[in-house]
A protein has these predicted regions:
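Glycine/proline-enriched, intrinsically flexible loops and inter-domain linkers
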Residues: 1-290
Length: 290
């Protein structure tokens, strides 16, 4: 196998969760670590987060968000680099020595924490109409999703802040990161939003505008890099037609464990407690910043 030893992977996953969440100020109350031989080739890490928010904000339902034509496309948080490119597709592929390193995001938990505080204050002051993260697909996903509300968008990629020079337009558009968000901001509210961002030391940049043209228009230094119909973008791909065969197997009843009379079960108990899926994980959990 080209995979690192399971122990190394396990320690790396735990360290990543511990460091990232502690530094970004998000409480981690627990966690579950389960071992199954069927996942030896590709371990899975699931992270679930629960958030609390008021039922209403500024007299409107807090859960409702809708970008409007004429709103500014504002990118906030971390800068764009070659890391995180094709991360969404990378997660669904077989891992091997030739897997692209650039698919892995190089995160910045401190930037994420500052951005979180900035967004909460901007939210309470009703300074944006909609917001979406730059996770899978980066700007292509966040802008493309919110442009459904308005029926189009125009993006100027040369305005996107970069970690370094040398990125192609398509790389700028799809690079993904968790500490980067896209906001739909009314033009008259941008200056106040910028003041709050400066207080929290968060970089925000106008990278385009939502339109109602029916097209997603992507430009780089006034050169058109992409011009896609919104209808095609969201509904143009053919759908898979999958077939499956169900091999029914009747569930066999579990054998009942009946110990011999007056037998000493201490060794059985110790063996059970020594199993990786039963043994206590308290030492690991206590390292999380509750």
């Amino acid at each position: 196998s080209t995979q690192p030893p399971s122990g190394r992977i396990c320690r790396g996953v735990h360290r990543s969760v511990k460091d990232r969440r502690n530094e970004s100020g998000i409480p981690v109350v627990n966690g579950s670590i389960y071992f199954d031989n069927r996942y030896l080739g590709k371990p899975l890490v699931f992270c679930g987060t629960g958030g609390l928010m008021p039922l209403e904000l500024n007299g409107k339902p807090s859960w409702k968000k809708e970008a409007k034509a004429g709103d500014l496309i504002v990118m906030s948080g971390g800068r764009v680099g070659k890391d995180g490119i094709h991360g969404a597709t990378f997660s669904s592929e077989e891992l091997h020595e030739g897997s692209p390193v650039t698919a892995v995001q190089i995160g910045d938990a401190i930037v994420q924490k500052r951005m979180l505080d900035f967004i909460l204050e901007a939210r309470d002051k009703d300074l944006f109409n909609a917001i979406t993260d730059n996770g899978a697909g980066g700007l292509s996903s966040s802008v493309g999703e919110m442009a459904q509300d308005t029926g189009g968008a125009r993006v100027n990629l040369e305005k996107v802040p970069l970690k370094y020079q040398g990125l192609q337009p398509w790389e700028i558009f799809i690079s993904e990161a968790q500490e980067r968000m896209t906001l739909s901001v009314p033009k008259e509210k941008y200056e106040e939003l910028k003041k709050i961002a400066d207080i929290h030391e968060v970089e925000i940049t106008i990278v385009g505008e939502y339109t109602n043209t029916g097209y997603l228009e992507i430009y780089y230094n006034d050169i058109r890099a992409a011009y896609l119909e919104m209808e095609f973008l969201h509904k143009g791909n053919p759908k898979y037609k999958l077939e499956a065969v169900w091999n029914y197997r009747e569930k066999q009843p579990e054998k009942e464990f009946i110990p011999a009379e007056k037998s000493n079960l201490n060794h059985i108990l110790l063996d059970m407690m020594g199993r990786v899926n039963i043994a206590s994980k308290e030492d690991w959990v206590r390292q999380y910043d509750h």
